[in-house]
Amino acid sequence: MENWYWKYDSAINADQCAEIIKMGDNQWHSGKVDTVDGNAEVGTGRSSDIVFLDDRSVYELLEQFALDANDNAGWRYELTAAQPIQLARYRVNEFYDHHLDSIGSHFDPRPRKLSLCVALNDDYDGGKFDFTMSSGLAEEEIATGTVIVFPSFLFHHVTAVTRGVRYSLVGWYTGPPFK
């Protein structure tokens, strides 16, 4: 694979990012991890709070990046739907261990093909978004508004936040099984 991920630096303006963060006010709950058997559980591999957003404008905003990256990166996966968009909050010492998104979801049996992550702020320390590659770790510096799109079968993680609060937006795009 030539392009393991596709990055859009500061593609969403800071005001839009702040508005998205506000959508999570008073709705936060502990993030769960989907397991291989299709269940979701609060586990030791993840420590963060999440909110699933149901705002059409956010779906439309993210979809343009997913479709563009799918084409420009050369993946050209058949995508048929977007799963619920997740707003995540990581406070000091919170993290998300190495994982892949393609295992599936307890609420949608279709395979996840593309994942998308948006940095909604950058006024924190730690909280690095990394890919685990066969060649080693690919660490990305992510400024506010940066969008990263990648195949859902790539291992990735978020390191522990050491100062401040990290906010991100995550989306997944599904389609028929790979052939």
Residue map of PLM features:
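Fe(II)/2-oxoglutarate oxygenase catalytic core
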Residues: 1-147, 153-179
